[in-house]
C-alpha cells in the first residue's frame, strides 16, 4: 500500500487533509511507514517476527515480558496488540496488513480518544494535528515532535498539494501527567511512557515484574478503580 493509498483511506473516514498527514507523520516517525516493523531493541528481523506473530507460536501480546512495539503505530501494550491481532484474524489477513492497521488505528482513536477524533475530523492546523496525535495517541518516551511535523509537512506537500499552514509552530508543551479519574487505559499508557510522573517510592526497578505490578496498582488507584 502506497502512502497515497493510506492517505486516501484516511480521508474516506472523514479526516481532514491536515489530520491525515499529521497521523501519517507520526506513523513515519514510529515505523518509517512499515506495517511489519518491530521495535529495533527486539533485535529481530521484521519479516521473521511477523511470521512468528501470524503463526500463533509466539507471545505477540507481551513478547515474553519485553513488550516490543509493532506496526505502523508501534503498538506496544498487550491489550492493544491483542485487539490488533484479533482484527487481523477476523479479516483473515496478516497482522502486518497495512489496510487493516490503518482501519484499526482509526477504530482506536474514534472509540477511545473521542476528543482527538473530533480534532481529526475538523482541524486544519497541521502542527496541532501532528502534536496531538503524538501526545494523546502515540505517547512516545521521546516526543521528537519536530521530526513528526517535518514528515507530516512532506506528506501534506506531496499528497494534499498545500503549503505549510503553520510555518512557525509554538514550542511544544510537555504532556500532562495522569490525573485522578482518568480512564485506566490512559493512565496505564502515560505511566508506561513517562516514568518521571511516578512517585519515587512507587518505582522499584525498570520493567521488572514488580514494576509492572506497580504500574497496574498505581493506575487503578488514579483511575478510581
Segments and roles (model prediction):
Residues 1-33:
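Export/targeting segments at the very N-terminus of extracytoplasmic proteins
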Residues 3, 16-20, 65-68, 94-102, ...:
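Solvent-exposed, acidic/flexible segments
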Residues 3-7, 20-24, 72, 99-102, ...:
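Extracytoplasmic/secreted envelope proteins and their assembly/folding machinery
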Residues 5, 31-121:
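Peptidoglycan-targeting cell-wall enzymes and recognition modules
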Residues 14-24, 35-42, 115-125, 129, ...:
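Surface-exposed patches in mature extracellular/periplasmic domains of secreted proteins
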Residues 27-31, 75-76, 120-143, 206-221:
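Acidic helix/loop microenvironments that form the catalytic cleft of cell-wall polysaccharide enzymes
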Residues 81-177:
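Non-catalytic cell-wall polysaccharide-engagement segments
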Residues 175-186, 190-225:
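Short acidic, glycine/serine/threonine-rich helix-capping segments at coil-helix boundaries
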Amino acid at each position: 500500500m502506497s502512502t497515497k493509498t493510506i492517505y486516501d483511506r484516511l480521508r474516506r473516514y472523514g479526516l481532514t487533509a491536515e489530520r491525515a498527514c499529521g497521523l501519517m507523520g507520526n506513523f513515519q516517525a514510529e515505523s518509517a511507514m512499515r506495517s511489519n516493523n518491530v521495535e529495533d531493541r527486539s533485535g529481530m528481523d521484521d519479516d521473521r517476527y511477523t511470521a512468528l506473530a501470524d503463526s500463533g507460536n509466539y507471545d505477540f501480546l507481551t513478547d515474553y515480558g519485553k513488550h516490543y512495539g509493532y506496526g505502523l503505530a508501534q503498538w506496544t501494550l498487550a491489550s492493544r496488540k491483542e485487539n490488533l491481532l484479533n482484527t487481523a484474524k477476523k479479516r483473515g489477513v496478516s497482522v502486518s496488513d497495512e489496510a487493516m492497521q490503518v482501519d484499526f488505528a482509526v477504530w482506536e482513536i474514534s472509540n477511545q480518544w473521542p476528543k482527538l477524533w473530533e480534532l481529526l475530523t475538523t482541524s486544519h492546523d497541521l502542527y496541532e494535528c501532528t502534536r496531538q496525535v503524538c501526545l494523546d495517541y502515540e505517547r512516545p518516551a521521546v516526543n521528537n515532535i519536530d521530526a513528526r511535523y517535518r514528515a507530516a509537512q512532506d506528506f501534506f506537500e506531496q499528497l494534499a498539494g498545500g503549503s505549510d499552514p503553520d510555518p512557525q509552530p509554538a514550542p511544544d508543551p510537555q504532556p500532562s501527567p495522569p490525573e485522578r479519574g482518568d480512564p485506566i487505559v490512559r493512565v496505564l499508557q502515560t505511566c508506561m511512557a513517562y516514568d518521571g510522573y511516578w512517585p519515587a517510592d512507587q518505582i522499584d526497578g525498570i520493567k521488572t515484574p514488580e514494576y509492572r505490578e506497580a504500574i497496574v496498582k498505581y493506575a487503578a488507584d488514579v483511575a478510581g478503580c
